[in-house]
Amino acid sequence: MKGCKMPLKHILGADHVVITVRDLDAAAAQWRKLGFTLSPRGTHSPQMGSGNYTIMFGEDYLELLGVLHETEQNKPTREFLKNREGIERTAFTTDDAAAGAADLAARGLVPLGPVHFGRPVDLPNGGKSEAKFNVFRWPLSESPGGMRIFACQHLTRNTVWIPELQKHANGASRIVAIEILAADPRGAAEHMSRLIDEPPSVADGVFRVHSGGKRADFVFYDAAGFAKRYPDAVRAGAAPEGAAALVIGTSDLAAATKALGTTGIAHHGMVSAPASAANGTVVSFVAQ
């Protein structure tokens, strides 16, 4: 019926955040210094042309992503890296990539995919397996606040959520928020809301859109709001616009503070690693 839109019943909340970097191994070393346990380095299927390290939590995770060779699939990532490193995109969990892409098409959007790919996995017991995925992307023009979004169907969760990789010296347990710097935070939040069917809210001039379920929030700031939230020393090296910060829940804030050492800056009830220490991304820890 004209004027109606299909519900996005196959989008289940934020799945993982992609931090795109120029030197994958150097980035891994930086994030280990923040107290994270990283997976062994992975190499995606040839058509993707990328490699990664993952930082696994309870239901979500971070992905450090690097380009290994040029392909059509990684062209947007290469364009992103011409300007900066940092949070390039966020994935949502989908239980059916084909159906999710069809839901977008029913709304008049042109999804990219689904695309099937995988990567070999070295298991803690010395064995080998494979992680397999189906993904689809919203059109590149639909990037709220400058952050691309896509959806990921995990076909082999047991080769991604490995218990030994979910234990971190900093106590990290989940992604609480993905924070986005936008000239028009209200407009960016409303854009995200339209794309994922989650209502926006506002408090003290800060706009928020929940990603779904018990997963992370997207929080949108203008430059003044971002400067109020983070001291100058924390914002050093952060992106001037787009996704700029992560808030990570920790079961032990003292452990997170210890893991960060002299890199950490305590403020507003949290402890933050400056963007200069995390590939252009402010990484903050809050007690959960």
Say what each PLM segment does.
Residues 2-14, 19-39, 57-117, 123-288:
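Glyoxalase I/VOC metalloenzyme domain signal
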Residues 38-46:
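Conserved catalytic-core motifs of GNAT/GCN5-like acyltransferases
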Residues 47-49, 269:
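Short acidic/glycine-enriched loop/turn segments that link adjacent beta-strands
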Residues 45, 118-119:
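Conserved beta-strand edge residues that scaffold enzyme active sites
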